[in-house]
A protein has these predicted regions:
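Bacterial signal peptide processing site
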Residues: 24-27
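Short beta-strand edge/turn micro-motifs at domain boundaries
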Residues: 120, 140-173
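Extreme N-terminal export signal peptides that direct proteins to the secretory pathway
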Residues: 17, 31-35
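Surface-exposed, charged secondary-structure patches
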Residues: 96-136
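Bacterial N-terminal signal peptides that target proteins for export
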Residues: 1-12
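Core segments of small alpha/beta cavity-forming domains
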Residues: 35-100
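C-terminal motif of bacterial Sec signal peptides marking the signal peptidase cleavage site
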Residues: 19-22
Length: 173
């Protein structure tokens, strides 16, 4: 895990094997006779999941003044209540330490896997135009990596898909 990743969001525990299985080229198992397999994901469902994931980064990467209630509401539209609270808490902690985010991170989605009401998005995110900055001066303290491996778990809830967990598995992407 890069130092940048751990400073930006300390979010979640591991989803063991999620990234490895997302990158597997093994075809899905055929259900035994008499069992009904879930229908394959529709392109529109993949697009919806990927759209929520991209919006999560747009909303959660708050670089302005102290996040307001409107920001928290926008965050809850794309993230679970638990993750929204973790992100908001981390943003407040950074502010109290004289740090803020700057720039933008650019998702480069490399895969989406849907399993019922759960989806895993793998990303080789470009953070080279973003990082942590001094809150008073705006002077960057660091810059993110151009190829940052990210694994996001989304859950289907009433109202649509929400990002539930963000992980930084490390390694090349």
């Amino acid at each position: 895990m890069s130092r940048f990743s751990s400073q930006v969001l300390v979010i979640a525990a591991c989803v063991a094997g999620a990234v490895a299985s997302a990158c597997s080229s093994t075809p899905p198992a055929v259900p035994p006779t008499g069992e009904i397999a879930a229908p394959p994901a529709q392109p529109s469902e993949n697009a919806a999941i990927e759209g929520v994931y991209r919006e999560f980064w747009s909303v959660s990467w708050v670089s302005s003044a102290e996040p307001d209630q409107g920001w928290v509401q926008r965050l809850r539209a794309v993230a679970t209540a638990e993750l929204s609270e973790q992100v908001a808490t981390r943003a407040r902690q950074q502010r109290s330490q004289g740090v803020r985010l700057y720039g933008t991170v650019t998702p480069q989605i490399t895969g989406t896997r849907i399993e019922g009401d759960r989806a895993v998005v793998t990303d080789c995110q470009d953070g080279s135009q973003a990082g942590l900055a001094d809150a008073a001066t705006g002077k960057p303290r660091n810059v993110g990596p151009s190829r940052n491996a990210v694994s996001a778990t989304l859950s289907r809830q009433s109202g649509g898909w929400r990002v539930a967990k963000i992980e930084y598995p490390g390694g090349e992407c």
